[in-house]
UniProtKB/Swiss-Prot annotation:
Name by which UniProt lists this protein: Serine/threonine transporter SstT
Family stated for the protein in its record: Belongs to the dicarboxylate/amino acid:cation symporter (DAACS) (TC 2.A.23) family.
Functional description taken from the UniProt entry: Involved in the import of serine and threonine into the cell, with the concomitant import of sodium (symport system).
A single GO molecular function term of this UniProt record: neutral L-amino acid:sodium symporter activity
Keywords attached to this entry: Amino-acid transport, Cell inner membrane, Cell membrane, Membrane, Symport, Transmembrane, Transmembrane helix, Transport
Classification via Pfam families: SDF
Catalytic activity: L-serine(in) + Na(+)(in) = L-serine(out) + Na(+)(out); L-threonine(in) + Na(+)(in) = L-threonine(out) + Na(+)(out)
Subcellular location: Cell inner membrane
Name of the coding gene: sstT
């Protein structure tokens, strides 16, 4: 197909989203540096982008989770129970690492507004009480008010109920999920313009301090991911196979992680992972199920992103967090991460759910999401590399452990 009369459209469709975001980020910095008055005016573009994210996020969570549970095949978990356990342990461990790192190296963000009417929770009891009330919220009201905890509860409940529905109904839910995901992708395609407006207005108002905040946040995020990849995951694998895990870890990072870093899609990396599993000589009936499932629920990188950005908002707003609440955040971040698969910007769009634990309003939470898009050039690539390479790593660890048991018997 050629575009002789539309060279700009041809350029946009052929250029990667990452490249376009980089251009938007640089353009925003240049505009803020040389024309600060104009930079403040284009901030409206960023506001439109954030509003679009706010509009699509509740529907996305509701439809995606409901369709995913409704279309889950019966008996799938019985074949991969050890791998499923590794996925869950790995994701929760990543969230715990992110909590510890966020307290050790707290990040502060430059937000447009700090609402004075906020009422942060007083402790774990108040958080749990608020959580229960959010769970039993009216589903329509939950969607309208962006009550993500209520949305998640209703999506899980309806998903379980629809598992017993006809194939036609479940196919309809799957098509609905695909339709919503397509709308999300369209919104994400406007990320370069949104980032341009956000960066320009932010730096025109706050100057280099905002850049320092983003740099610190990015270092914490990438540091957590590297720590999980080279310390936590090898420790989990060692406990499973009882031998040096690093040859396997490095193989997975090299063969799977590098590809995922550039594709920025766990789903797109599934064929690469399946081929790697075949080369490693793993059991086909196992990895043919565990790899696609891992691309759905094994989201250590997403758990890190959700936790670090949520606690960055908490620190910025001066909200005190006790240990039980931090543990609850780790659990919530892990659950959120499992629902972030296959969606452009999925982990970022689930940040408001985690923020709601601390009474942070949706307006502020979506500003944090926008910050996430600014640093997503590296964050999303590193997150996908960690997620996808861990799919193969834990699958291989479980298979090797089963072989060790069989040989010892």
């Amino acid at each position: 197909m050629t575009y002789p009369e539309r060279p700009l459209l041809h350029l946009l469709t052929r250029t990667s989203l990452v490249g376009q975001i980089i251009v938007g980020l640089i353009a925003g910095l240049l505009l803020a540096s040389f024309f600060p008055a104009a930079a403040l005016k284009v901030g409206f573009i960023g506001k439109v982008f954030v509003s679009a994210l706010k509009a699509v996020a509740p529907v996305l969570v509701f439809v995606l989770v409901m369709a995913s549970i409704a279309n889950h095949r019966q008996g799938q978990q019985t074949h991969i129970r050890p791998i499923l356990l590794l996925y869950l342990v790995g994701t929760f461990s990543a969230a715990v690492v992110a909590v510890i790192a966020s307290f050790a190296f707290p990040s502060s963000l430059v937000l447009a507004s700090h609402p004075g009417e906020m009422s942060p929770p007083g402790g774990i009891a108040e958080v749990l009480q608020s959580l229960l009330l959010s769970v039993v919220d009216n589903p329509v009201n939950a969607l309208i008010s962006a009550n993500f905890i209520g949305i998640l509860a209703w999506a899980i409940g309806l998903g379980i109920a629809f598992r017993h529905a006809s194939d036609t109904t479940r196919n309809l839910l799957s098509e609905l999920s695909n339709g919503v995901s397509l709308i999300v992708k369209v919104v994400i395609r406007f990320a370069p313009l949104g980032i341009f407006g956000l960066v320009a207005s932010t730096f025109a108002e706050s100057g280099v301090e905002a850049l320092k905040g983003y740099a610190h946040l990015l270092v914490v995020l990438l540091g957590c991911m590297l720590f999980v990849a080279f310390v936590v995951n090898p420790l989990i694998v060692f406990l499973k196979i009882r031998r040096n895990p690093y040859p396997l870890v490095l193989t997975c990072l090299r063969e799977s992680g590098m590809t995922a870093f550039f594709t920025r899609s766990s789903a797109a990396n599934i064929p690469v992972n399946l081929q790697l599993c075949e080369r490693l000589g793993l059991h086909e009936d196992t990895y043919s199920v565990s790899i696609p499932l891992g691309a759905t629920i094994n989201m250590a990188g997403a758990a890190i992103t959700i936790t670090v950005l949520t606690l960055a908002a908490v620190h910025t707003l001066g909200i005190a967090v006790d240990v039980p609440t931090a543990i609850l955040l780790s659990v919530v971040a892990s659950v959120c991460a499992c629902g972030a698969s296959g969606v452009a910007g999925g982990s970022l769009l689930l940040i408001p759910l985690a923020c709601s634990l601390f009474g942070i309003p949706s307006e502020v939470a979506m500003q944090v999401v926008a910050v996430g898009f600014i640093i997503a050039i590296l964050q999303d690539s590193a997150e996908t590399a960690l997620n996808s390479s861990t799919d193969v790593l834990f699958t291989a660890a479980a298979c090797l452990a089963e072989e060790r048991k069989a040989s010892a018997a």
